[in-house]
Amino acid sequence: MTHWIAGDWVSGEGEMIQSLSPYNSEVVWKGESATEAQVESAVNAARNAFIEWKKLPFENRQAIVERFAELVKDNADSIAEVIAKETGKPFWETKTEAGAMVGKIAISIRAYHERTPYKEREAAGNKIVLRHRPLGVMAVFGPYNFPGHLPNGHIVPALLAGNTVVLKPSEQTPWTSEVIMKLWQKAGLPKGVINLVQGARSTGEALANAKGIDGLLFTGSANTGHILHRQFAGDTGKMLALEMGGNNPMVISKAFGDLDATVYTIVQSAFISAGQRCTCARRLYVPEGEKGDALLARLVDVTKNIHVDQPFSETTPFMGSQISIAAAEFILNAQKKLQALGGELLLEARSLGHAFVSPGIIDATNVAELPDEEYFGPLLQVIRYTTLAQAVELANDTRYGLSAGLVSTDDSEWDYFVEHIRAGIVNRNRQLTGASGDAPFGGPGASGNLKPSAYYAADYCAYPMASMEGDACEIPEQLSPGLTL
């Protein structure tokens, strides 16, 4: 039983899919995907459940969500273990994901009250009222890199606002979503309020094409996001929120301060989660000269000693595997392409078996036309620069705009950087992957269109209803011109 539809666990009727553990290629989950008809059933179940769910007082919806939060706390280690087995991320890291799920629930409850409150005031003898109403049935597309945390950041705000949900997780992490859906079931969620459909592209297309959805919250690749954007073009009746990737720049000033602290910040920016975070640094801008040379030498020395291993290794790894062997091969092929364009290897990314890839660093300064691509893995491109203005200009030369960062102890450099850089998340002397759950997450350009995550997700899960109210109809002292009564 791999799908949760209308409160029942059912088997799929489509093609067989399976989840392979990327660090040993063992099958950890398998089942049949949902057919178009089953997706339609899930959407219909959500539509039917919406009628009563939206009427339920907020306090009742909150109570169910908070029971779910307690279940996540109680099962945090088992959730983390499943995520580690499916993604290959170190166990210590997946434990933080389970904790983040709970933290985002508290943020979402606060956001509901602060972003979508009930307000009323008097104006010119009228009562002006602002209410918020749920959109209806929300489709949620989850990514593989944070298969618990990121869908949770859409599902919880949607439910709190009174929407119902159909979740389609990544086909590479179906097990995680199944485990989490069973916790929602234990929390006492009414039948049909959340529905889970598993599958690959055809299942996703069926859900995105379903007439019964009112909105779609997507986290994933730019390519898939752009397909959805074109598909929804002209359909003003549905809300589409896209969180996609980035070709994120990190600029290191000559005034970078402590050498090892800077190197640590770069490593955390580029190689955390084996480079599989959408905010990871992809391009590193380093000043020409001796200070830049020393920085790169130290960075290479530290990076080549990064411990890469299985999630549960006795010697705790910093990095795990890529999500799949195909993803690992993509990084190695990207390295070859950059070399062919004139890139010089400072540290070669190597295959370590199964889906493991060691971190790589390539000097792309002499690449005449650097591809504007997101290499979703542990491959860092270095570009040398002469002035901060040049570095910022190069950093902005991308169709993306998710995250960017400056390492500098000079306040005037930061003032210049934050004024001229184009990105939605901009950090100073902190890793690019650092983001607050109660701040907007996203950026302009090909990185997405809205910021439907964490605190600001409330904005996209309800629409404002403005009312001008009176106890009874009135006749004004002076009628409008041309009227007689």
UniProtKB/Swiss-Prot annotation:
Record EC number: 1.2.1.71
The source's superkingdom equals: Bacteria
One Gene Ontology BP term is: arginine catabolic process to succinate
What broad class of enzyme is this?
Answer: oxidoreductase
**Positions of the catalytic residues:** 243, 278
InterPro entries, A to Z: Ald_DH/histidinol_DH, Ald_DH_C, Ald_DH_CS_CYS, Ald_DH_CS_GLU, Ald_DH_N, Aldehyde_DH_dom, SuccinylGlu_semiald_DH_AstD
Q: In which pathway does it act?
A: Amino-acid degradation; L-arginine degradation via AST pathway; L-glutamate and succinate from L-arginine: step 4/5
General function of this protein: Catalyzes the NAD-dependent reduction of succinylglutamate semialdehyde into succinylglutamate.
Q: Which HAMAP family match?
A: Aldedh_AstD
Q: Which NCBIfam families match?
A: arg_catab_astD, PRK09457.1
What protein name applies here?
N-succinylglutamate 5-semialdehyde dehydrogenase
Query: What is the species listed in this Swiss-Prot or TrEMBL entry?
Result: Aliivibrio fischeri (strain MJ11) (Vibrio fischeri)
